Amino acid sequence: MKKLALFALLMVPAILLASGHDSGEASRYLTQTGRESDFWPRVINFTIFAAILYYLIANPIKNFFKGRREGIAGQLKEIESKLQAAKDEKKEAQSHLNESVNKAAEIIEDAKKEAEILAAKIAEASENELVVLEKQFEEKITLEERKAARDVIDEVLSENITTDDIALDETKVVDIISRKAEHGKVA
């Protein structure tokens, strides 16, 4: 591209100078310089101008584009580092999410086990309480049976024993109790 631009800069003035002029102007130049055309001096002047222009502008233009390239490279690196940081954060968040899901599953499983243990303890306590209540009920029944038997014995003894019967022997007491039992008063 550079070579094409330099070639165009050299050829355009040559083409312009090659166009025809009035003969009066050409003769005047010939008398002043001793040459028929000023093509070569103009080429030399243009070359000097282009060289000076290149000398003055080339480094600032190179520096500008170099700075621009470095700026773009820096921005690209910054964007890549941000992208990598975002990917790392995403991975970390994903690992935290997986860890939380695992922990939640573990908590749920522990809660189920704890519920089973509590249910078993409650069932066991209920069974123990039922056993105790049944035992108390049986003891109360036994106590009531004894109490009823005592009441019946007291009643039988108080009704059937008179002052004449104070001298009772064992056979007589058994006979009285068996009579009462036959009538259905002893449970």
UniProtKB/Swiss-Prot annotation:
It is a single-pass membrane protein. Its main location: membrane. It is found in: Cell inner membrane. It holds the Pfam family ATP-synt_B. Keywords: ATP synthesis, Cell inner membrane, Cell membrane, CF(0), Hydrogen ion transport, Ion transport, Membrane, Transmembrane, Transmembrane helix, Transport. Belongs to the ATPase B chain family. PANTHER family: ATP SYNTHASE SUBUNIT B', CHLOROPLASTIC. F-type ATPases have 2 components, F(1) - the catalytic core - and F(0) - the membrane proton channel. F(1) has five subunits: alpha(3), beta(3), gamma(1), delta(1), epsilon(1). F(0) has three main subunits: a(1), b(2) and c(10-14). The alpha and beta chains form an alternating ring which encloses part of the gamma chain. F(1) is attached to F(0) by a central stalk formed by the gamma and epsilon chains, while a peripheral stalk is formed by the delta and b chains. F(1)F(0) ATP synthase produces ATP from ADP in the presence of a proton or sodium gradient. F-type ATPases consist of two structural domains, F(1) containing the extramembraneous catalytic core and F(0) containing the membrane proton channel, linked together by a central stalk and a peripheral stalk. During catalysis, ATP synthesis in the catalytic domain of F(1) is coupled via a rotary mechanism of the central stalk subunits to proton translocation. Component of the F(0) channel, it forms part of the peripheral stalk, linking F(1) to F(0). This is ATP synthase subunit b. It comes from Sulfurovum sp. (strain NBC37-1). The lineage of its organism: Bacteria, Pseudomonadati, Campylobacterota, Epsilonproteobacteria, Campylobacterales.
